[in-house]
Amino acid sequence: MAYEVTMNKQGQVLGRKGQETRRRLMTATRRLLCTSSPVDLTAVAIAKAAGTSSASFYMYFDDVQDVLYALSLLAAEDMSEVISFFDRAWDHEVIEAEALRLVEAFNSVWSKHREVLRYRNLEADRGDSRFEELRMNTYVPFIEKFAQRIMSINPVGGGRRKGDAYAEATVLHAAMERLAATDPVVMERGLGSKRMN
């Protein structure tokens, strides 16, 4: 995906210092998300946590939702690496181990970006077209490649139809995402991928 911003909101080319300030604002937002709801974040709080002014915040982002969208783009880049798991050959003799590696990689991305991905889904569910498009740009390739993997394991001659494989991939993706979105403390009590062993 290679998400990169080269200009600020005023159309000026971002140099090293500008890129660093933008990165600090994004890092501060991510830190604040660990203790605050995304709907409670303010540009002032983010700028203060980043050690800059709110005027600087608006040089790089339109509003808090804009910085959360930028963080969602980074999460999408990480999720594209998980999707690439489907591009390599899976050993059918140890298919459960292959599936577990996929689930663990998926959970790892969610652990890194949980608050941002929850917000992405919230805004998509509320009808924000930017967040909906971003979510679908992640979901569709994942589900398509997952369905293709299901078909390769149990081809049409084996009784599974293409539509069934897509339905199974959709349900499995939804289940994986729901578990990954769950509070980490709950996951550490033995729910999720550790139960698959």
Question: At which residue positions do the language-model features occur?
Answer:
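Helix-turn-helix
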Residues: R24, A28, L32-D66, A70
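Amphipathic alpha-helical linker/stalk segments
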Residues: V13, L71-E98, L117, S152
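Generic hydrophobic, amphipathic alpha-helix propensity
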Residues: G18-T29, I46, L71-M79, F146
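N-terminal intrinsically disordered/low-complexity leader segments
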Residues: M1-E20, N154, G158-R161, E188-L191
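Short, hydrophobic secondary-structure boundary micro-motifs
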Residues: T42, L117-N121, E132-E133, G158-G159, ...
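Alpha-helical DNA-contacting segments of helix-turn-helix folds
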Residues: L33, D40, V67-A75, R120, ...
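Amphipathic alpha-helical packing segments from all-alpha helical-bundle domains
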Residues: E77, E81-I83, S108-K112, Y119-L122, ...
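Hydrophobic alpha-helical connector segments
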Residues: A70, S84-K112, A165-L172
